[in-house]
Amino acid sequence: SFQGLLSHVAALRRLESYYYEGAKYLQSLEGIDYYDFICDVVAGFDENPQAFIDRLKAVLETILTTDQLVATFVGSKVDFDHFKQVSEDFFKHLGTHKVEKQAFTNPVEVLNEGFKTAQEINYVAKGYNQTLLGVPVNGMNLFLKSVLGLDYLWNTVRVQGGAYGGMSVITDKGDVAGLSYRDPNIVETLERYDGQVEYLENFNLSEAEFEKNLIGTFSTIDRPLSAAQKGAVAFTRYFTHLTQEKVQQFRDEILAATPEKVRAYAPTM
């Protein structure tokens, strides 16, 4: 793993960097590209340590500013008053310079890589982003994640294939991927990912199984949350511009799911 990332998450993030510029940038911060950067730093540090120190100071001075700073707090009114006082004292020590937006010029590229480690198991990821194919995102994405993850991939990758986990990753920004965890296979797992197309083409669960997947879908968006989790959700929605109206739209689209709509997604899988 890299920077504390779990291996299967590292595989997924690398996959996303093939088609999404934001994920490509993230590789430089915590992924395999970051690992390569650290290796280069270590290799050349003895030759010019001061140059590296100067670069770190420059980065630190750039990011430690109150410009566009957003703080999140979850707690009581009394705790907030204390937080406000402490945070304001901290903010006084930050810079006030404006941060200029920088263009990200590292283009995405499909690499289809494999990375060898000392482990005798694999973490296999394959996917894409459906919006690049002109397929819009809606609540059906969340329902498909439940159907593919709890039924097809669970049975084919985990039960039949022997992996510790077989997961469907389908996000509200259009990412669609198959992901395995502690998997003894590679080629077989990739073939099972491809088999999702046929599975969806022939999708026809019983009414009870269909409702089970419907309930499983809602458990991911309407589950009980702790105060800290509510704060994390609010923080994420703020920066991704996900409104409560959009969340309700997803709910309505999930409730409108039918076997016919599921089968209609087969060509894009």
At which residue positions do the language-model features occur?
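A short, acidic, amphipathic alpha-helical segment used as a generic capping/interface helix at domain edges
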Residues: F52-L60, I254-M269
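Glycine-rich, charged/polar anion/phosphate-binding loops
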Residues: R55-K57, V108-G114, A163-G165, R263
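M16 family metallopeptidases and their MPP-like homologs
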Residues: S1-E47, T66-G75, Y123-F143, L153-P259
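Short, hydrophobic/aromatic alpha-helical segments in well-folded domains
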Residues: R55-V59, V86, F143, L153, ...
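An aromatic/glycine/proline-enriched structural segment found at the starts
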Residues: V70-A125, Q130
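Acidic/histidine-rich
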Residues: L150
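A general structural signal for short secondary-structure junctions and capping/turn motifs
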Residues: L60-T65, F115-A118, V157, P267-M269
